[in-house]
Amino acid sequence: MGAQKSIHAGRAKIDVNVDFTHKLCTSLMFPAFRDTSSPLSLVIGSLCIKHPNLFGGSEKLDVSWDKGLYDSNVLVAFRRPRPEWRPQQCFFIQHSLSPEIGVHGTPVDNFSRSGSGGVNLSKLALGLDLSEPASSKWSSTTSIKFEHVRPINDDGRAITRDLDGFPITCSGNTHDSMVVLKQESRFAKATDQGLSHFSMQIEQGIPVVSKWLIFNRFKFVASKGVRFGPAFLLASLTGGSIVGDMAPYQAFAIGGLGSVRGYGEGAVGSGRSCLVANTELALPLNKMTEGTIFLDCGTDLGSSRLVPGNPSMRQGKPGFGYGFGYGLRFKSPLGHLQVDYAINAFNQKTLYFGVTNLASST
């Protein structure tokens, strides 16, 4: 369900890629944000245009556009060639619009799904990424960006308060602005016996203007995989915290795929801090099929009361939750099919379905 075309413009070749499957398959794994009768309402079409030699000096221009029924994302990135021993530069400008579900969404069906809270975020960002040359198994990226965040309701009108009358922005105005300096370091190692992965992100809000947000936020992800004969055990720990100025939408949202399965997005809680642990054991059933059992748990470490307006408490989120279950992974030349069956702490059952890596036609 994709198409790719190369167009020759002078000496340059422009690659155009249209994809209706990647986002679609991701969205099928999530319950609908709003009252929709089919997960197909979350289909997102992707258009990507790449120019590998914009000014004749190997400058690269990438333009991507993702558009769905409720959200959209436009990204323009420009890269200049530099010696391999110097940091690689990428100038970017990005605009996105999406429902804010993790913090302002309302949990339903024993916290297994999250409905719309009537808050959407329109974000405009522009900045510079500097990727350091990889050293051994370590790599790092430094970026600085200006970000403008404007909350809007489902009708597209700017808002300053949520449905309960509490402020959405940190400034109290219809928007928040900030300059953010970000440093990310990554370690990755893979062998026949297993894998190790660690990443650390640190973000610092810079006080360029007095009303702009000043904060420090960090997040880490540590994963370890070990092979026991045909079985493979993967465990990961994710955590983070934020201090300083903060808008509610900046809180860590706990719950959902990639967090605690069996819960809706952010249905476990949302706080200034978080800690999430995931464990999954995979066993091959045959050449094409793999079975898994998993256990997820997460907590806001009692920090939800420190989020302005305490949206987690107002929505009755527990602040701690766990989910367990089993799943199947099917591999084929056309793509990978994933099915997960999860049960949360309230004995509510949720079925996740997804397809990835579909073959594209040219």
UniProtKB/Swiss-Prot annotation:
GO MF term set: channel activity
Alphabetical keyword list: Chloroplast, Growth regulation, Membrane, Plastid, Plastid outer membrane
Gene Ontology CC: one annotated term: chloroplast outer membrane
Gene3D superfamilies, A to Z: membrane protein fhac: a member of the omp85/tpsb transporter family
Localization, UniProt: Plastid, Chloroplast outer membrane
Tissue: Expressed in germinating seeds. Expressed in the vasculature of roots, cotyledons and leaves.
Keyword Nucleotidyltransferase attributed: no
Recorded phenotype for the gene knockout or disruption: Stunted growth, pale-green leaves, altered plastid structures in leaves, altered photosynthesis activity, and reduced accumulation of starch in leaf chloroplasts.
Main function: Beta-barrel pore-forming protein which possesses voltage-dependent channel activity. Required for proper plastid development. Involved in the maintenance of metabolic homeostasis of full-grown plants.
Family under the similarity heading: Belongs to the OEP80 (TC 1.B.33.2) family.
The protein, known as: Outer envelope protein 39, chloroplastic
Classification of source organism: Eukaryota, Viridiplantae, Streptophyta, Embryophyta, Tracheophyta
